[in-house]
């Protein structure tokens, strides 16, 4: 691991920066952060103070681009939030048809590859 990667990994505010990028819908910043965190002990599926993962928040916001990015970097589409809702439930309830279709496709693909 390079010195730059080690310093990124040891930043105490990494989780806050990650969640802030998600809340702001900043795909470019989030992509950069996730790329730099690939060699770290960083959990893309961690829950924020509202009981949501970054994926849940991106679905709530209707941000398909961010949803795709998070899934690419390992976000678990089957995780439930503190209310028991998966990303698919949230997308359907919010009327985000593009995200619903994407999540169904990903779920179908991931279950057939097991």
Curated annotation (Swiss-Prot):
GO terms for molecular function: enzyme inhibitor activity; phosphatase regulator activity. GO terms for biological process: Notch signaling pathway. Keywords: ANK repeat, Developmental protein, Notch signaling pathway, Repeat, Transcription, Transcription regulation. GO terms for cellular component: cytoplasm. InterPro entries: Ankyrin_rpt, Ankyrin_rpt-contain_sf, PP1_Regulatory_Subunit. Induction: By Notch signaling via a CBF1/Su(H)/Lag-1 (CSL)-dependent pathway. ANK repeats lie at residues 50-79, 83-112. It comes from the Eukaryota. PANTHER family: MYOSIN BINDING SUBUNIT, ISOFORM O, PROTEIN PHOSPHATASE 1 REGULATORY SUBUNIT 12. Belongs to the NRARP family. Forms a ternary complex with the intracellular domain (ICD) of notch1 and rbpj/suh. Promotes loss of intracellular domain (ICD) of Notch1 in embryos. By down-regulating ICD levels, could function as a negative feedback regulator of Notch signaling that attenuates ICD-mediated transcription. Involved in angiogenesis. May be involved in somitogenesis. This is Notch-regulated ankyrin repeat-containing protein.
